[in-house]
């Protein structure tokens, strides 16, 4: 297996993980806002996410003479460690599935601020002790405190967004829900309404797959808080991804026939025939898979408490790639910039 031993290699892994893990949520949100059912998107995502883990395991896990290699460990009696790795994958899959719906209700930037901050607070604290305290506590834990403050700022941004949208939409009646297929044939023209106006919000609502008007945003915040997630690194990541794939596959096939949150019913045949946004969904899965793999590798070299901090990039990408409505009001701009400053 390939083992990273240099500081430069560790930094490279961290930077690539930052880029990949910060990009895929924006891509997933893009497909939902274009009307693709989240069940279809997640099924595509989970396939390429697993494929990325397989590629990493059979390449980086085999190319070096260092032992034990990936294939060697597949036949070893290490089931206690395997079960721990698979448990982590299950929690990751449930968390990712929850955040996919939270993005629609709360917004990408707010969701990522809260989920990533909670994940870093819990994960970094646990990993510090599990790593035999190899990281400096006087540096690590002040950063953890900043993430706790970021949760408060994220809630403030959410409150500002909700009040702003409510004032803009006064006088408009509730919108009728439409299916993903209907949105593909809709006559709505992109860019017709000015970003941030009531007309723009209505256009987005008509086109998106998850309808949020008339529903309490407390649902989204509740989903957001729920979302918080002796083998070699490649074998552990492989089993981690296998369990994540299994849970995501089973739950989303169930959601095809028994959808939640008022989504239209679909079928496995409809999923196979739905090529609208499939390429983006595949790309999101690859980015997340390789990002997680690089985070595992960087964590092996620098300590998993330090590697857990790569979650902060999700905030920057969530706010600036998706734009959402944070630029509409100076108050929201100040809140968001404060969050980014605290978490950098």
UniProtKB/Swiss-Prot annotation:
Membrane-crossing residue ranges in chain numbering: 11-31, 43-63, 79-99, 102-122, 137-157, 209-229, 236-256, 279-299
GO CC, alphabetical: membrane
Similarity comment: Belongs to the plant ureide permease (TC 2.A.7.19) family.
Extracellular side: 1-10, 64-78, 123-136, 230-235, 300-344
Molecular function (Gene Ontology), one example: ATP binding
Topological domain spans for side Cytoplasmic: 32-42, 100-101, 158-208, 257-278
Protein name, per record: Ureide permease 3
Residues engaged in binding ATP: 209-216
Top-level taxon of origin: Eukaryota
Pfam families: Ureide_permease
Chain's role: Proton-coupled transporter that transports a wide spectrum of oxo derivatives of heterocyclic nitrogen compounds.
Keywords for this protein: ATP-binding, Membrane, Nucleotide-binding, Transmembrane, Transmembrane helix, Transport
Cell location: Membrane
Membrane topology: Multi-pass membrane protein
Record's signal peptide: none
């Amino acid at each position: 297996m390939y083992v990273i031993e240099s500081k430069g290699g560790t930094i490279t892994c961290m930077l690539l993980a930052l880029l990949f893990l910060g990009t895929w949520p924006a891509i997933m949100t893009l497909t939902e806002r274009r009307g693709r059912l989240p069940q279809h998107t997640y099924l595509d995502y989970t396939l390429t996410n697993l494929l990325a883990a397989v590629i990493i395991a059979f390449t980086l896990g085999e190319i070096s003479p260092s032992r034990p290699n990936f294939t060697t460990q597949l036949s070893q009696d290490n089931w206690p460690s395997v079960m721990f790795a698979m448990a982590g994958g299950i929690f990751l899959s449930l968390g990712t599935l929850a955040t996919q719906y939270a993005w629609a209700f709360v917004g990408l930037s707010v969701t990522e601020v809260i989920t990533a901050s909670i994940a870093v607070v819990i994960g970094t604290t646990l990993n510090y002790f599990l790593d035999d305290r190899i990281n400096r506590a006087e540096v690590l834990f002040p950063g953890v405190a900043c993430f706790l403050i970021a949760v408060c700022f994220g809630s403030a941004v959410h409150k500002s967004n909700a009040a702003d949208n409510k004032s803009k939409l006064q006088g408009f009646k509730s919108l009728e829900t439409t299916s993903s297929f209907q949105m593909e044939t809709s006559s709505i023209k992109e860019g017709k309404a000015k970003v941030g106006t009531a007309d723009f919000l209505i256009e987005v609502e008509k086109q998106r797959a998850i309808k949020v008007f008339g529903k309490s945003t407390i649902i989204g915040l509740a989903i957001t808080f729920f979302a918080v997630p002796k083998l070699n690194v490649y074998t552990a990541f492989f089993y981690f991804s296998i369990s994540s794939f299994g849970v995501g596959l089973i739950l989303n096939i169930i959601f095809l026939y028994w959808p939640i949150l008022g989504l239209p019913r679909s079928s496995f045949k409809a999923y196979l025939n739905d090529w609208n946004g499939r390429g983006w969904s595949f790309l999101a899965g690859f980015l997340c898979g390789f990002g997680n793999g690089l985070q595992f590798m960087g964590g092996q070299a620098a300590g998993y408490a330090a590697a857990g901090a790569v979650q902060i990039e999700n905030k920057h990408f969530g706010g600036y790639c998706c734009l959402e409505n944070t630029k509409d009001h100076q108050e929201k701009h100040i809140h968001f910039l404060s969050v980014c400053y605290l978490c950098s």
